[in-house]
Curated annotation (Swiss-Prot):
Source organism per UniProt: Emericella nidulans (strain FGSC A4 / ATCC 38163 / CBS 112.46 / NRRL 194 / M139)
Domain NodB homology span(s) in chain numbering: 40-222
Lineage: Eukaryota, Fungi, Dikarya, Ascomycota, Pezizomycotina
Keywords: Carbohydrate metabolism, Cell wall biogenesis/degradation, Chitin degradation, Chitin-binding, Cobalt, Glycoprotein, Hydrolase, Metal-binding, Polysaccharide degradation, Secreted, Signal
Gene name, Swiss-Prot/TrEMBL: cda
Sequence positions that bind Co(2+): D48, H97, H101
Protein name as it appears in the record: Chitin deacetylase
Enzyme Commission code: 3.5.1.41
Annotated acetate binding sites: D47, Y138
Length: 237
């Protein structure tokens, strides 16, 4: 009998050692996050797409073996389900940027929630999942916005490097201003980078200059989830 019990306890102990631990999300919900926590990582993020320029950006990221995060909008996502699939298939993270790009603090609870759930209804058929990470339009939040994001289980991502690429859409300004902003804020310790894949000069010029600088500094260009220590399973609902 004692020999049998010993075998049972041995089997239970062995099973405990080999059974995977349940998923524990490391990143809190409903709190504004501006910085990566994994050493030597940088998160390039692109808002407002997908757009006609997104395939070119995906090609560029592939050439540099870099991963990025795309915070997408409702209509753009609805018109480009194949690009959403390509993003995920190539190791990038698809995040939520609301359906209509409206300032969330201007809305009540139900309006804020609707902006997120309507976008989920577009993304889920394309990917089979919906994002668990979001970026508020204009980086604007208030306590009600953050409460809704907690209730909907969203991680709220801001930025510590703002390229302001939307203000600098010509060949000179994108380098002299946006890329210089990138360098200055990188030097100051920023590592979550805000840009937009809906703008030609961002994709045609700025993105590659940023990737070259990332490589020169020995940094790893990865997704927001990864730079915060979250595995891919935690990027989605």
């Amino acid at each position: 009998m004692f020999a049998t019990l010993a075998l049972v306890f041995t089997a239970l102990a062995s099973n405990a050692l080999t059974t995977p631990l349940p998923l524990v999300r490391r990143v809190p919900t409903g709190q504004v996050i501006t910085q990566c926590t994994t050493p030597n990582t940088i998160a390039l993020t692109f808002d407002d797409g997908p757009s006609e320029y997104t395939p070119q950006l995906l090609d560029l990221l592939s050439r540099y073996s870099a991963r990025a995060t795309f915070f997408v909008l409702g209509d753009a996502a609805a018109q480009n389900p194949g690009l959403l699939q390509r993003m995920r298939d190539e190791g990038h993270q698809v995040g939520a940027h609301t359906y209509d790009h409206v300032s969330l603090p201007s809305l009540g609870y139900d309006g804020i929630a609707s902006q997120m759930t309507r976008l989920e209804e577009v993304i889920r058929p394309a990917l089979g999942v919906a994002p668990a990470y979001m970026r508020p339009p204009y980086l604007e939040t208030n306590e009600l916005v953050l409460q809704v994001m907690r209730d909907l289980d969203y991680r709220v991502i801001s930025a510590s490097v703002d390229t302001k690429d939307y203000e600098n859409q010509d060949a000179d300004a994108i380098i002299n201003t946006s890329f210089q902003l990138f360098l200055d804020q990188l030097d100051a310790g920023g590592n979550i980078v805000l840009a937009h894949d809906i703008h030609y000069w961002t994709v045609a010029s700025l993105a590659e200059r940023m990737l070259q600088e990332v490589n020169a500094r020995g940094l790893i260009a990865t997704t927001v989830g990864d730079c915060l220590g979250d595995g891919e399973i935690a990027w989605y609902h």
